[in-house]
């Protein structure tokens, strides 16, 4: 009996040791590594080790659920294949030197809750496909070179809590749908040429107090969710 228990224990440990993410996810990560010059990162990846041991990568139940590579000297572009990380819940690539455009394929990563690519050199328009990220709570795209308008599709992200597009070259108006979201706590649009529509008010945003978000709501906006539009004097 003792030998049998030992055998099962060894088989279990062996299964855990050799458990890996799917080939599709690993391929997407390696594409990403190559396209952002992984060999010159501050902390690189060793492809001969399990993906779970790669710097900044979080694996749960053999699925890649988070990639956090802030301040890691990423240079290059984001490959279309990044959309194959369909189980990803958090993608944090802020403060690197990523260029090119934001791949439309990111709109297929429907488990994403956080997408943060602040302080890079991305350009072009913000893809309409981001409106497919129904679980998205945090969207941070500040200090890039995005142009065009904020996609109207973002007005359908009912779980969005923060939209930060500070310091880009965006124009147009804020999507009307965002004015009706009770979850939205912070809207940062300063240092663009965005026009605030009548559905938004210049108000002060306070910290959340337990379950109550403390907004000062002008009487004319009683029927709407009032959001904070931060100015260039803000540091967040």
What function would you assign to each model-found segment?
Residues 61-97, 217, 231:
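Mid-chain, structured segments of secreted extracytoplasmic proteins
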Residues 61, 83-88, 107-112, 131-136, ...:
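Leucine-rich repeat
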Residues 161-236:
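Leucine-rich solenoid repeat scaffolds
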Residues 78-80, 102-104, 123-128, 147-152, ...:
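The feature encodes a structural signal of leucine-rich repeats
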């Amino acid at each position: 009996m003792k030998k049998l228990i030992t055998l099962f224990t060894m088989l279990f440990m062996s299964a855990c040791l050799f458990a890996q993410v799917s080939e599709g996810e690993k391929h997407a990560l390696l594409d990403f590594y190559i396209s952002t010059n992984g060999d010159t990162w501050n902390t690189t990846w060793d492809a001969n080790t399990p993906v779970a041991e790669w710097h900044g990568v979080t694996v749960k139940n053999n699925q890649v659920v988070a990639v956090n590579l802030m301040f890691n000297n990423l240079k290059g572009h984001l490959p279309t294949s990044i959309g194959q990380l369909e189980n990803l819940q958090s993608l944090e690539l802020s403060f690197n030197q990523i260029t090119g455009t934001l791949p439309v394929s990111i709109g297929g990563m429907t488990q994403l809750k956080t997408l943060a690519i602040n302080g890079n050199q991305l350009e072009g328009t913000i893809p309409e496909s981001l409106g497919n990220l129904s679980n998205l709570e945090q969207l941070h795209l500040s200090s890039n070179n995005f142009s065009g308008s904020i996609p109207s599709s973002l007005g359908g992200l009912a779980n969005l809590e923060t939209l930060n597009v500070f310091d880009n070259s965006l124009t147009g108006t804020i999507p009307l749908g965002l004015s009706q979201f009770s979850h939205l706590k912070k809207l940062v649009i300063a240092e663009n040429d965005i026009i605030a529509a009548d559905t938004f008010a210049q108000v002060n945003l306070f910290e959340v107090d337990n379950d109550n978000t403390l907004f000062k709501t002008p009487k004319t906006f009683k029927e709407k969710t009032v959001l904070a539009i931060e100015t260039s004097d803000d540091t967040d």
